[in-house]
From Swiss-Prot:
Protein name as annotated: Glycine betaine/choline transport system ATP-binding protein OusV
Matches recorded under NCBIfam families: PRK10070.1, proV
Species of origin: Dickeya dadantii (strain 3937) (Erwinia chrysanthemi (strain 3937))
GO cellular component: plasma membrane
PANTHER family, per database record: GLYCINE BETAINE/PROLINE BETAINE TRANSPORT SYSTEM ATP-BINDING PROTEIN PROV (PTHR43869), GLYCINE BETAINE_PROLINE BETAINE TRANSPORT SYSTEM ATP-BINDING PROTEIN PROV (PTHR43869:SF1)
UniProt gene name: ousV
Length: 400
């Protein structure tokens, strides 16, 4: 994947004469110590990130960690003190005002926690408001606004007013307003945090659907760990203005950078994070290669030699065919039937992307370990009851 948005050694010092803070940072003083000595606030300290085109990149941290400051540095709503912000390789921190406005209009949009809808404007005009300020002709901006409302399922409310909409619907309007100019990059600063839990989940689903239809680069600020795990391709953890760790949810869960990250992720429900492919194992299991010379007798011999009750039948190229047992193979032999007649109706294979939470009932009810397949139906391995319990036990280990 190409790098869409890159941040290199980015700093933001709030206050006059920020060079004083840099001298103290070089001496190893902390953010709090610098504030005590100078009154200067270190908002972001030496942040470096490379965000890929089309990914949802979540930035997390406690209040005061610098996450909202960092996202505003990406479109220069806050001016960086030092460092670079590159969009498609161009350093926007050096752009003159006119060129910066063009970038904001065409390439990057932002959704805030507050809906900030104009009560005297209908939903269509609220969605088109930014384009109106930019001088876009009325017919063009209304068409773009209507297209954006269609994307979030609100086209029938185009002529309604904000007070006629629920909180979740008003936030959809805020999202539509950001989508109206079809940006490549979408910045979302705790955009769903003011919503009720059920509505928040609906908005997360909406964002995932939008991303499936049109791959944008999304930088999403959140303090909600479940939200980050649910929507994020990768997560950055911030603390005291610094980026502490960047990785996929399972990378961070398995290898936290320090005690702060470990504590931050305490209590996470890993059954919604890990998937079948994360815990599937190819051994120990009896694999039967389906070739012209292999029938029930050959398959039965393989199971007996490996002391297995069940076997997993694969075609050339590891394409999964099904599961057989010693009993089903003996029955096929008695009836002089081919190997296909020995295949069991269960367990059915599960997709690699299935979450552990969804796997629980399937694994619990299966007579043997459940096979896992990829999108091409190729065999990846098996998941037994013991393997699933061991994986779920990681949650209690994390929370100890």
């Amino acid at each position: 994947m190409a790098i869409k948005l890159e941040v290199t050694h980015l700093y933001k010092i709030f206050g006059e004469h920020p060079e004083r803070a840099f001298r103290l940072l070089e001496q190893g003083l902390s953010k709090d110590q610098i504030f005590e000595k100078t009154g200067l606030t270190v908002g972001v300290k030496d942040a470096s990130l490379a965000i890929e085109e089309g990914e949802i990149f979540v930035i997390m941290g406690l209040s005061g960690s610098g996450k909202s400051t960092l996202v505003r540095l990406l479109n220069r709503l806050i001016e960086p003190t030092r460092g670079q912000v590159l969009i498609d390789g161009e350093d926007i921190s050096r752009l003159p005002d006119g060129a910066l406005r063009a970038v904001r209009r065409k390439q990057i949009s932002m959704v805030f926690q507050s809906f900030a809808l104009m009560p005297h404007l209908n939903i269509l005009d609220n969605t088109a408001f930014g384009m109106d300020l930019a001088g876009v002709p009325r017919a063009e901006r209304e068409q773009k606004a209507l297209n954006a409302l269609q994307q979030v399922g609100l086209e029938t409310y185009a002529h309604a007013y904000p007070d006629e909409l629920s909180g979740g619907m008003r936030q959809r309007v805020g999202l539509a307003r950001a989508l109206a100019n079809d940006p490549d990059i979408l910045l979302m600063d705790e955009a769903f945090s003011a919503l009720d839990p059920l509505i928040r989940t609906e908005m997360q689903d909406e964002l995932i659907k939008l991303q499936a239809r049109r791959q944008r680069t999304i930088v999403f600020i959140s303090h909600d760990l479940d939200e980050a795990m649910r929507i994020g391709d990768r997560i950055a953890i911030m603390h005291s203005g610094e980026v502490i760790q960047v990785g996929t949810p399972d990378e961070i869960l398995n290898n936290p950078a320090n005690d702060y990250v470990r504590t931050f992720f305490r209590g996470v429900d890993i059954s919604h994070v890990f998937t079948a492919k994360d815990i599937a194992r190819r051994r120990p299991v009896a694999v039967i290669r389906k070739t012209p010379g292999v029938g029930p007798r050959s398959a039965l011999r393989i199971l007996q030699e490996e002391d297995r009750e069940y076997g997993y039948v694969l075609e050339r190229g590891r394409k999964f065919i099904g599961v057989v047992s010693i009993d089903s193979l003996k029955q096929a032999l008695r009836g002089q039937q081919p190997l296909e007649q020995a295949l069991l109706p269960a367990p059915a294979p599960v997709p690699a992307s299935m979450s552990l939470n969804e796997l629980i009932s399937q694994v619990a009810q299966a007579p043997c370990a459940v096979p896992v397949v990829d999108e091409n139906h190729e065999y990846l391995g098996i998941i037994s009851k013991g393997m699933l319990l061991q994986a779920l036990d990681k949650e209690s280990t994390l929370n100890d």
